[in-house]
Design a protein with these regions (language model features):
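Beta->alpha loop/short-helix hinge microenvironment recognizer with preference
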Residues: 1-406
Length: 406
C-alpha cells in the first residue's frame, strides 16, 4: 500500500471491472465456487442488458426509438440499490429518538473468521444473536443500566481494502425501558456499557450457541479461539443521524458502491480507500482476479437479513416502542392509513387536506428524445426471455433508428 497518486491509466467502475473479468474468472474457478457466488456474478453480468428485459420508447416527432433495460436489483450489484438506500434512510430517520445515541461494534476474532466464511448463514446468525443478547444482558443488569435496549443492527463483512472482516454495527439509543415499563432510564451521556464485559459475554454466548447448534464445529476450531477477546468498540454518536446515514449506504449494497478504479499499464487495478486511522486517501494495487476474489467473499446467503432490530425496536415490540415515545413525550407515529385520514384542526370532515410536500420525493420527469427533445412515448415492455419485436403494436417501428442493440 502507498499514498494515492495520479496515474495515466484508464478508469473503470466496479461494475465494469466485474463485467470485464467475471467470464474468465468463472471459466477458471466456476466449478469450485459456491453456487451463490456464481448466481450473483450472473446477475451482475446481465444487469441493465437485454437479457433482463426492458422497455422501448418512441419519439413521434423524429421517429427515434430508445431502449432501456431492467436492473438486476441484486443487493451485491454495485450499480443497483441507490434509491432503495435513500428510501430506507427516509423511513428510519423519523424513528430516531431525541436522546444521545451510541454506535457499538462487535468484531469477530481472526481465529473464527475462516469457519464463519465457510458457514456464513449459521455464523452470521450466531454473531447477530450473541452480540445483541450481550448488549441486553448487560443493560438489564440493575448494577449497569437496569433497562431493556432498542437495537438496530447491521452486519458488515469487509474492510476498506475488501478483506474479510465480519462485524456488526449497532445503533443504540442512550437509554432503555425499565422492567415495569413505567420509566425511561437514560444512560450517561458518553458511556453506555463496558466494552470488556460486552466482549466476554458475546464470546460466551457465541460458544454456547455453537455448541448447541453445531457441536462438531468445536472440534474443528483451535481451543485458543475461545481465549481471544472479541473486539468491541462503543462511541457516542450524537443524535444518531450521521450514524444512520452511514449504515444506510450498505443496507442494499455489499462491500462497495460503483466507485472508480484505475487500470494500470501492467494490468493491475488500483483501489483507492480512506485510511481509518489517519483519514488520508491511500491505495492498494490488485490483480483483477484478486479483486474479484475479495469482492465475492462478501456475498451473503440467499434471503439473509443483514439488518435486524432487537428489544423494543423489534417489529414485534411496537407496543413497547409506543410506550418509549410516550415516556419521552414524543407524538405517536401514524401509520400510512392514519396519515391519509388525518384532518387538520378546524377542517370539515370529508374534505381533503392539501397534500404535504415531500422534500425527498423526485418529480415525475418525462423522458425526452436525445435528438429533438420531444417527449418520448412508451411503446412496449418485455420480460426476460420475451422477443421484444413480437410485442410491438406497430411493426413499422421495428425498422426505426435506435440508440443501442435491442
Amino acid at each position: 500500500m502507498a499514498a494515492a497518486a495520479q496515474n495515466d491509466g484508464g478508469s473503470l467502475s466496479v461494475h465494469e471491472v466485474l463485467c470485464r473479468w467475471a467470464p474468465a474468472y468463472l471459466a477458471q474457478f466456476g466449478a469450485a465456487m459456491p453456487s451463490r457466488q456464481r448466481e450473483v456474478l450472473q446477475a451482475i453480468l446481465t444487469c441493465r442488458t437485454p437479457a433482463r428485459g426492458g422497455a422501448l420508447h418512441y419519439c413521434p416527432n423524429c421517429d427515434h426509438r430508445q431502449f432501456s433495460y431492467h436492473s438486476c436489483n441484486d443487493r451485491h450489484c454495485p450499480q443497483c440499490g441507490g434509491q432503495e438506500a435513500q428510501q430506507w434512510l427516509d423511513e428510519n430517520a423519523p424513528l430516531l429518538l431525541p436522546v444521545n445515541y451510541f454506535l457499538v461494534t462487535f468484531t469477530v476474532p481472526e481465529g473464527l473468521r475462516r469457519w464463519i466464511r465457510s458457514h456464513p448463514r449459521l455464523g452470521y446468525d450466531l454473531l447477530l444473536a450473541a452480540s445483541s443478547q450481550a448488549l441486553q444482558d448487560l443493560a438489564q443488569n440493575p448494577k449497569r443500566l437496569g433497562a431493556t435496549l432498542g437495537l438496530l443492527g447491521v452486519l458488515h463483512t469487509w474492510t476498506r481494502t475488501l478483506e474479510y472482516h465480519p462485524h456488526v454495527h449497532y445503533l443504540v439509543p442512550g437509554g432503555g425501558l425499565s422492567r415495569d415499563q413505567r420509566q425511561w432510564i437514560a444512560s450517561r451521556p458518553r458511556f453506555l456499557l463496558p466494552v470488556k464485559a460486552l466482549s466476554d459475554r458475546c464470546r460466551t454466548l457465541f460458544h454456547e450457541a455453537l455448541q448447541k447448534q453445531m457441536p462438531a464445529a468445536l472440534a474443528d476450531l483451535p481451543p485458543k479461539v475461545w481465549q481471544q477477546r472479541w473486539v468491541v468498540h462503543s462511541a457516542a454518536t450524537g443524535s444518531g443521524q450521521n450514524a444512520l446515514r452511514y449504515l444506510s449506504r450498505y443496507v442494499f449494497k455489499t462491500a462497495t458502491g460503483n466507485r472508480q478504479l484505475q487500470l494500470l499499464p501492467d494490468g493491475r487495478l488500483r483501489w483507492p480507500f480512506r485510511h481509518s486511522g489517519t483519514g488520508t486517501w491511500q491505495h492498494i494495487d490488485l490483480q483483477p482476479f484478486e479483486f474479484l476474489r475479495r469482492f465475492l467473499q462478501h456475498v451473503l446467503p440467499s434471503g439473509f437479513h443483514r439488518v435486524r432490530r432487537f428489544g423494543w425496536l423489534h417489529p414485534g415490540g411496537r407496543a413497547k416502542f409506543k410506550r418509549v415515545r410516550a415516556l419521552l413525550k414524543i407524538p405517536p407515529l401514524l401509520s400510512a392509513a392514519e396519515q391519509a385520514a388525518w384532518q387538520p384542526p378546524g377542517q370539515s370532515p370529508g374534505t381533503s387536506p392539501a397534500p404535504t410536500p415531500q422534500p425527498n420525493a423526485l418529480p415525475a420527469v418525462a423522458l425526452r428524445c436525445p435528438h429533438c427533445g420531444h417527449t418520448l412515448v412508451l411503446v412496449s415492455q418485455w420480460r426476460p426471455g420475451q422477443n421484444w419485436r413480437a410485442l410491438m403494436p406497430d411493426p413499422a417501428l421495428g425498422v426505426l433508428r435506435t440508440t443501442g442493440p435491442p
